Amino acid sequence: MKKLLILVSLTVFSFSNAIAVTLYDALNQTYQNNIQLNAERENIKASEQDINISKADFKPSLTISGSKSFENTNTLKNQNGGTATKNDVDPFTTSIKLEQTILDYGRDLTLERNIISLNLAKAQLVKKEQDTLHNAINAFTNLILAREKFNINSKNLNLLIKQVENDKIRRDRGQITNADVAQSESSLAGAQAQFAISKSELLINKLNYENIIGKINDPNTLKKNSNSIVSIPKTLNDAINLSKQNNPDIQIAKLDLEISEKDISIVESDLKPTASVSLEKSYTDDLSSTIGERDKDTLKATVSWPFSLGGKNKYKVNKNTNLTTRKRLLLDDIVKTNETNVASAWSNMEASKSFLNSVKVQLKSSKIAYEGITAEYERGSRTTLDVIQSNSLLLSAQLSLVSSERNYLMAQYNLLKAVGLLNSQYLKLK
């Protein structure tokens, strides 16, 4: 028993010479290094390049070209059928052309669409931030919970080891029976099993933490918080109003609808006129048998207005109209669902808070009862079973408290996520 007690004591993580890791530190680490977030940031950069590409269509194009041809006339006859003199030429032509599109409805609409797409990419990044940071908070709090359960079960195991040793001494003195010792040993076996489980859970949650957030050497360095590191909405109405403005799912659905509406306009622009002007300067050497060289300037204006594309345009408009109707319905559904989700998150937070307060009262009562029963047991007025049952209730209350504290904290962050505030800007991450 003594060897087991020493082993348990050595297994518990030490707090000495450790630098505390706060939730804010862990979230910053996740925000900077998470692969999925970095991928979404690249998506924003790609959307920015789409805007640059669209803007380039508004600028003039400059084309330089040159050609060289070699001619070999095999037969050349006059109108009367006689053979004409063959004078082969090898023309060489160079040109430079400056062209500017001055009217293109599709070009304007495409730029507007790409600007909306950039806003969509930013909203998708916010959504990914929420999911990633929520996972990080979950991993952080789960590791703290596993650590506390491990410590509680460790202390309980040490307590029951001493209990068995004391009961054996009292049995040898004739104060209790073998049945009492057997009860203590049975309780110890259960505590050993719970300790093994809590040790395994601690390892699993440590690995999960490292997978989501990053390397951690000692789980005891994690600093526990009772409340969220940022303020939460004060009332349910405040939460609902904030969610309408900030929930990324709503923002994404709105932007998807705007893009779909813009797609209709782009398709319709296929039947609208376009206009361009160009200026070309060309030089040709050895142009023909009668002309040695030519230097020419050409100013050209072009207007194009397609009137029919065989019905293809009509079907494209119909298709995009159907898609727009679909996205409008999806937006309406998300807006309705959002209010329900926020109300549910708020209700769960309030319930978690009430349950936590009840567990605190339960733990206080369990401590008083255990101390009283233990004292009475020492005086011989209580049985071993009374002590074991009282200790079991105390252990249950202790485990329930740490779980309730964690659940209440997560409920606060669940509300922030439902509202749309669990992002880098609101959390002030760098």
Language-model segments: which ranges?
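Bacterial Sec-pathway N-terminal export signals of envelope proteins
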Residues: 18-67, 73, 216-258, 306-307, ...
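Amphipathic alpha-helical coiled-coil segments
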Residues: 39-54, 128, 132-153, 162, ...
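Small/polar, glycine/serine/threonine/aspartate-rich low-complexity segments that form flexible
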Residues: 65-100, 223-233, 265, 278-316, ...
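A glycine-/polar-enriched beta->alpha junction
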Residues: 28-38, 45-60, 95-113, 119-130, ...
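Positively charged n-region of N-terminal signal peptides that target proteins for export
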Residues: 1-4
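Bacterial N-terminal signal peptides
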Residues: 7-14
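Periplasmic alpha-helical coiled-coil/stalk elements that build and connect Gram-negative outer-membrane
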Residues: 21, 25, 131-245, 256, ...
